[in-house]
Amino acid sequence: MTRGLLISVGQHSDKGRKPVNQDFHGVLIPEEPLLSLKGIAAVLADGISSSTVSQIASESAVKSFLMDYYCTSESWTVKTSARRVLEATNSWLHAQTRKSQYAYDRDKGYVCTLSAMVIKAATAHIFHVGDCRIYRLAGKALEQLTDDHRIIVSSEQTYLGRALGINPQLEIDYQTVEIQAGDTFLLATDGAYEFVDARFVTSAINEHAAELDGAAKAIVEEAYRRGSDDNITVQILRIDAVPEETGVFDRTSTLPLPPLLEPRAMFDGYRIIREIHGSSRSHIYLAVDAETEETVALKIPSIDLRDNQAYLKRFLMEEWIARRIDSPYVLKPRSRSTRRNYLYVATEFVEGQTLRQWMLDNPRPDLETVRRIIEQIATGLRAFHRMEMLHQDLRPDNVLIDKTGTAKIIDFGSVRVAGVAEAAPRAADAEILGTVQYTAPEYFLGQGGSPRSDMFSLAAICYQMLTGHLPYGAQLAKIRGRSDAWKLRYRPAIDAERGIPGWIDGALRKALHPDPYKRHEDMSEFVFELRNPNPAYLNTRITPLLERNPLMFWKLTSAALACAVVVLLALLHAR
């Protein structure tokens, strides 16, 4: 049985010597699949003492984090999800203050400090603003993991430098900590940590190891006994088990693999019409839903790869990914009300042809047609990128052009989902999944991909549509190290006969640069430059062969000289 993430929790809060408890805290341990996809969240907030409404701020901050974090996209990383939630909470709190009688006195507004920890797989993600603290127990000592955002005026006077709700823009500290079974973390407000030492904390945790609520209560009571004049809150998290690094979709599907299908056969409520495509990776069939009469495409795993667990894991993810992308330029999944009995993927049927076939049928397309297709593909890719996904295998075979000229991105078997990759970071980038001719150089260098890598693939397709060949030919397949990447020679796309101006070549050259940091910062910038001449490219000329490929220039020069010598010798001999 696969081991999952297990923790023990202890919490206690007390108003102490104050009339109102302005602290708030909470822990949420979700069920699967959210446990693997989003992790366990623990949050602690402390309302500022100068405000009579800060308890509302701290309660709102904790509740919104625990509720909204799990409503963010499952494909997002912990960092992205938590930041979006905290930024939204900060904006709401700041707006509440501006609408209240405390608009011109922020020290009396809806302001609180906050520290949060999200434990996902074997990593603790820490988010912090203010002066709550997060510690890790190290033997009999406490290792402080957060920094207090306090500005020291004198030995007796300090004030908060950062907090939720105090400014319209939020600056959050973020860090990650690798965890292992047995690790213990402590979250505490200043009413606790300023009055209780590490020796008492570790002693209380060890004494109440079987019941951590008792440890938290003992620490709070000791802080009160030692004179704490503030609200006192403590949370204790102990890691009991860390999940094996297998990934979210590594559990073998309980559904059986389907057989090869024949025309006119009935399969799981679908009537098979014919096979559309067959390859070493999968088989795709045209089918009709017997219940709705809707035409669909069914994709089943290849027989040759049915024992390949890595392939089956990626196959399981394809429909999951498709359901999280909403774009007219990305293939849409299809679902049925009845229970599925086999492992396959059902999608909309697109009547058309692959971009590869379209390029063969249209070897010299006009520039405007190319622009329209590239713009559609770029829009589809941006839908992936908004969800923190990378396609990683964009090529003409993975784009369909329907009868109306609409482009649709297909095949999600190589897609990298950042939020899922966090669950198995060492396995996430283990192999290059894309097609070599369209794969960005950084993948070959083991650097991993980014949205700029997908842009490289898109630019390579654009280049091929305009010129009929690839920008680097077969050079990409020869990359073995950084020096090989810098040796790549871009072949200019300028072609007066084809009507490709220099500024188009300039846009392509930049998007296809071997160094991802020298490409366009965003795909929209590249697409914009395909329609709007960048002044920097307007004087672009056809680069002489000597500059483009000095080695080839001297080889040709030497060959020409050799031929000339042979001719001269022949003439002399004839005399």
Where are these regions (language model features)?
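C-terminal lobe helix-coil module of Hanks-type protein kinase domains
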Residues: 437-537
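Conserved protein kinase catalytic/activation segment
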Residues: 398-409
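AlphaC helix of the protein kinase catalytic domain
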Residues: 355-365
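PP2C/PPM-type serine/threonine phosphatase catalytic domain
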Residues: 1-297, 303-317, 338-346, 350, ...
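Protein kinase catalytic-loop region centered on the HRD/HxD motif
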Residues: 379-389
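Activation segment signature within eukaryotic-like protein kinase domains
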Residues: 373-374
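Conserved HxN/HPN-centered segment at the entrance to the catalytic loop
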Residues: 326-334
